[in-house]
Regions:
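Histidine-rich, glycine-flanked metal-binding segment
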Residues: 1-2, 8-47
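Short acidic/polar active-site loop segments enriched in Thr and Asp
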Residues: 90-91, 156, 247, 299
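Metal-associated gating/positioning segment near the N- to mid-region
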Residues: 44-111
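Active-site-adjacent C-terminal substructures of enzyme catalytic domains
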Residues: 131, 226-327
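Divalent metal-coordination and catalytic microenvironments
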Residues: 6, 43, 54, 88, ...
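Metal-coordinating catalytic core of metallo-dependent amide/deamination hydrolases
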Residues: 98-103, 107-232, 304
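Structural signature of the urease/amidohydrolase superfamily beta/alpha-barrel
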Residues: 1, 23-24, 242, 249, ...
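Single conserved hydrophobic/aromatic residue that forms the stacking wall/gate
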Residues: 325-335
Length: 335
């Protein structure tokens, strides 16, 4: 297959040209191509596929409406794959919640992992899927739950999360109640029923986090699985992650945490939906403000819960004057 008249984006350049491919790229040429059989892009961009490190979009296909769990799990996984690939994402780390703080999401854990595993084994997906375990450290039963799944052959990334009320992302408890409680459209209809005992048993969650963090970190280090620290809020959070051999700060919630992560040479992953919306859904640091402050504060964008936001973020960055590639002068910024 040949595509012509495309604005081709490569590692070090963008140019109008053509590309010939058959499963893999055969050749790329600059300039116009006189071939009536080629697909004419009419100057539209042709970009490499995106790599998505953290998206829980799959869960929406398993629970498309409140309390409505989709019965055909493979079909749900394929529907998610179609959305992922149509958003320009060719490699995806499906972020799967391991640990209990919403009952309905816990109930689909086994089905989600099984569907990704079977879909990969059977070659049903267009994108290349990997498992990313979001380990909820505040769950006293996390280690028992994790034991059933940590030997899956497709696990490639693990993030250490702490959603204890009053900590990290939910340091503002009112925002937590608004998100999971009566103010939530999900909960008001009975789904994503936030387990309010988490608020009543805040101390239990803190104790679980303290016990689980070193043990879970050890498990992943021994299995040579890359880890990310989730929702870092203070310098202490970032320092602790770095001491545990973690090099990724995923969705840091404050400017303080972002700057400390960069100081320790950790990679920062920020939410593309936050960037596109100009604000966080839970009142955390605005990615738009970070980018305006310094492009270098953000290493990686994640589509999180909106797959299409990843490619939209690229063009918003260009509108802000960020270079699409670093080896050219500012006059070559692509808009």
């Amino acid at each position: 297959m040949i595509i012509k008249n495309a604005n081709i984006v490569t590692l070090n350049d963008t140019f109008i040209g053509s590309i010939n491919f058959n499963e893999t790229i055969l050749n790329i040429d600059k300039g116009n191509l006189n071939n009536s059989n080629a697909i004419d892009f009419e100057g539209d961009y042709l970009l490499p596929g995106f790599i998505e490190l953290h998206t829980d979009n799959l869960e929406k296909h398993f629970i498309p409406r409140p309390n409505a769990i989709w019965p055909n799990k493979i079909a749900a996984a394929i529907a998610n794959d179609n959305e992922i690939i149509s958003s320009g994402i060719t490699t995806v780390f499906d972020a799967i919640l391991v640990g209990n703080y919403t009952k309905i999401r816990t109930s689909i854990l086994d089905d989600i992992i099984t569907s990704i595993t079977r879909g990969k084994d059977l070659g049903l997906f267009k994108a290349d899927h990997h498992l990313h375990y979001r380990c909820e450290l505040s769950d006293p039963e996390l280690l028992e739950t994790l034991e059933k799944y940590y030997d899956n052959k497709y696990i490639a990334l693990a993030s250490l999360m702490d959603h204890t009320p009053g900590q990290r992302q939910w340091r503002n408890k009112e925002k937590m109640l608004e998100f999971y409680g009566k103010g939530s459209n999900f909960t008001s209809h009975g789904a994503y029923d936030f387990d309010e005992k988490m608020l009543r048993l805040e101390e239990t969650a803190k104790e679980a986090e303290k016990k689980n963090r070193p043990k879970v970190s050890t498990i992943w280090r021994e299995k040579k699985i890359i880890m990310a620290s989730h929702d870092d809020t203070t310098e202490e959070h970032v320092n602790e992650a770095s001491k545990n051999g973690i090099y990724i700060s995923e969705f840091p919630t404050t400017l303080e945490a972002v700057k400390q992560a960069k100081k320790l040479k950790m990679k920062t992953v920020l939410g593309a939906p936050n960037f596109i919306r100009n604000k966080s859904h839970s009142d955390n640091v605005s990615v738009n403000d970070l980018v305006d402050n310094n492009f270098d504060l953000v290493d990686i964008f994640s589509s999180d819960y909106v797959p299409l936001s990843l490619i939209q973020s690229v063009f918003k960055l260009l509108d802000k004057g960020c270079l699409l590639y670093t080896s050219q002068s500012p006059r070559d910024t692509v808009r």
